């Protein structure tokens, strides 16, 4: 087994379920020391108790949509955060609402969670990484970060923002000759509860699963791909059949518009 992850401090948001939970389990098995973050402290404690070398892992309950909570965590756990070798921005929230019906509150919550939360944590870990001249920042995006899709205007905007931010950060770090790896992950359909928690026009949860996700990748498969790509220091990786739409939009924009216009939501 590779020693790549041995004793690395890996901070994972959205760690209590889905891809985040799968990453926690697999990286703990590889010898990483995990900082588990999500809003569900009880679930985090339950997960941590099942990990190998459980005493080496830490729990940091966090609502990434709340700047005050983030700032309190950064102050109270400053030493721990300064030690982070790998940050995985996995926490996120999706959307199922027509643009003209979506409330401003729901749009702001999506941006706070998916963009401002991720960038706040990124800026928190960067000083330690830059001082050591080593580190990795991995952010979960979506094919919606490469093209717009019906019922996901604010979600897509948040993911486009993630791409612009981290592409710019990568260029800045490269220009400064810093050995800090930036990777964007664009998974297509993954069998998680993300659609269940997606926001409707009034900001309430959809509270039902999209049937298409049932045939998607498992979180375990997705986590394995992310880990492998991180070890190879990839800049951007794709999973699932949806990646074909990225190329269609780039080279056949008329066909792409025809495809998304005919899209029927679950």
Question: Which ranges hold each PLM region?
Answer:
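Conserved glycine-rich cofactor-binding loop
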Residues: 9, 16-17
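Residue(s) in the substrate-gating loop at a strand-loop-helix junction
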Residues: 142
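Active-site helix of classical SDR
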Residues: 122, 158
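Conserved glycine-rich Rossmann-like NAD(P)H-binding loop of the short-chain dehydrogenase/reductase
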Residues: 30-47
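SDR active-site lid
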Residues: 174-240
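The beta1-alpha1 cofactor-binding region of Rossmann-like NAD(H)/NADP(H)-dependent oxidoreductases
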Residues: 62-72, 104
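Substrate-binding pocket helix/loop in short-chain dehydrogenase/reductase
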Residues: 98-99, 103-108
């Amino acid at each position: 087994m590779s020693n790549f992850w041995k004793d690395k401090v890996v901070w994972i948001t959205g760690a209590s379920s889905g891809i985040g939970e799968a990453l926690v389990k697999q990286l703990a098995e590889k010898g990483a020391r995990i900082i588990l973050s999500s809003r569900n402290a009880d679930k985090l404690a339950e997960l941590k108790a099942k990990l190998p070398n459980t005493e080496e892992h830490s729990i940091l309950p966090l609502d990434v949509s709340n700047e005050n909570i983030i700032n309190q965590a950064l102050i109270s756990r400053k030493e721990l955060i300064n030690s982070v070798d790998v940050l995985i921005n996995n926490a996120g929230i999706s959307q199922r609402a027509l643009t003209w019906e979506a409330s401003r509150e729901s749009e702001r919550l999506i941006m706070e969670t998916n963009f401002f939360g991720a960038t706040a944590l990124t800026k928190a870990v960067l000083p330690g990484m830059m001082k050591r001249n080593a580190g990795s920042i991995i952010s979960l995006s979506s094919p919606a970060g490469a093209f717009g899709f019906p019922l996901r205007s604010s979600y897509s905007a948040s993911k486009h923002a993630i791409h612009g931010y981290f592409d710019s950060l990568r260029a800045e770090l490269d220009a400064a000759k810093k050995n800090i790896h930036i990777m964007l992950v664009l998974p297509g359909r993954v069998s998680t509860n993300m659609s269940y928690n997606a926001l409707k026009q009034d900001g309430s949860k959809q509270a039902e699963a999209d049937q298409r996700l049932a045939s998607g990748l498992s979180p375990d498969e997705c986590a394995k791909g992310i880990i492998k790509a991180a070890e190879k220091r990839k800049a951007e990786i794709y999973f699932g059949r949806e990646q074909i739409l990225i190329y269609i939009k780039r080279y056949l924009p008329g066909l792409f518009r025809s495809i998304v216009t005919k899209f029927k939501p679950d």
